[in-house]
Amino acid sequence: MKYVLVTGGVVSGLGKGVTASSIGVVLKACGLRVTTIKIDPYLNTDAGTMSPFEHGEVFVLDDGGEVDLDLGNYERFLDIKLTRDNNITTGKIYQSVINKERRGDYLGKTIQVVPHITDEIQDWIERVAMNPVDGKEGPPDVCVIELGGTIGDIESMPFIEALGQFSYRVGPGNFCLVHVSLVPVLNVVGEQKTKPTQHSVRGLRGLGLAPDILACRSTEPLEENVKAKLSQFCHVPDQRAHEAILKVLDLQFVGKVPREPKLVEWTERASKFDKLKATVKIVMVGKYTGLSDSYLSVLKALLHASVAMGRKLVVEWVPSCDLEDSAAKETPEAHKKAWKLLKGAEGILVPGGFGDRGVQGKILAAKYARENNVPYLGICLGMQIAVIDFARSIMKLPGANSTEFDPDTMSPCVIFMPEVNPEMVPEFEKAGLSFVGKDESGRRMEIIELPSHKFFIGVQFHPEFKSRPGKPSPLFLGLIAAASGQLETLLQPSSNIVNPNPMPRFPIPKKTIYHAKKPLDSLVNGYFANGNVIHT
């Protein structure tokens, strides 16, 4: 097993996750099987309870693991399926060690950071790195490890020590360190400065790790003299990253590894993206709109679909609170701006969320889309609020609500389990709302559709987690197609649009009964074309 460690210096937010994912893509394009591990030094055992404002989106894996958003990047870039064990946190490591101590596994020894915590980290990495993630038998060839945070952080120290030991454990030729750093440009002189990177590398070396490669971020491409200076003072080669990595890992002469990575698919996709001119405007209505990373997978799914449909994506962010009637009095300018953006939408998307703040604004967004025939996609809570709006507006149940927001509502159209109240489903369907996807018991409503509408879909699950650059989610593909006037073309049997991704993602049940009702079904049908789904 070969290991590539990606660390970061100078400042946080430099793009270690994208760097790690890109390295994985290049190695995969060289013919190697790649897996990934993300290390998060925080004490939480996982990201499930963290606010999106704290850490961005919580990405959900096939096994239900709630993890850092970088694992979503890995899955999208490499088209792999990871598990919760691919995300290591300080909380998980300490919890594992304490559990072993309570069982007596350490035979009465004093438990210390070194060696017990550091050994646990190394053992965890070695164990998880051997698990195949690409659907094939046998262990991967290379494991790319990303260490979260910045070199010098106190909370990262046990991991730095463990990884230093780990480089000796696996031996020369099996460990490559890529350090991501910042090369700032001072406006006063307009010169690219290398000192921050030099100091970061010196600090890394002082902790027992020496970088083999530098990945430098700057506002402009690095000048040749800057590259030469960094190469000289930090003792790293200049350019040709894949060759440098293969050389450090003793892989450059392995028979199955081509000298040049095959990146034609990626370069063609990038070229297509750069040439896009016609736009499609999607309005995102949510409560965490102040931080785009809160909806990262949704944004990526929209981007994948937009490129596939030949459109340049324009996303307008609307805080759901600003749409509410109370905002007209409290923040009139924000209220006016929010409604102006909503009314200029070519498509409306209401993503998942929880809590009652801003819910009324989301209901109003769904109502506007329904009444004005604007393409609409509601995900999780976005589906539930569409049901609430339908109950209030069409079925004349003004008090209709979710028991999450009003436990005493007289018309509980959404309940804790199974969500949409199954007792009210016949009334909904009689009024014109179709429940086209259900679980095998027929009680859990998974997909709603408004047959009289151009495109009005709500889903209880999260299709954004399965979208890939070359295989966009069909539900997002449908939204973009409807918003750009291409839905009929997309639904033609002869359509050469990229094939929809057929795999649903947690938390959709193991079996979903899909009831075909209208032409749009051919799009949604493709989403459920796998062994876990029953077609009727």
Language-model region placement:
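Conserved phosphate-binding and hydrolysis motifs of nucleotide-dependent enzymes
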Residues: G15, G382, Q460
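Flexible phosphate-sensing "switch/lid" loops adjacent to ATP/NTP-binding sites
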Residues: M1-G347, G353-G355, G361-Y368, P375-L377, ...
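Short, basic, helix/turn surface patches
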Residues: L61-G72, Q232, N401-V414, E446, ...
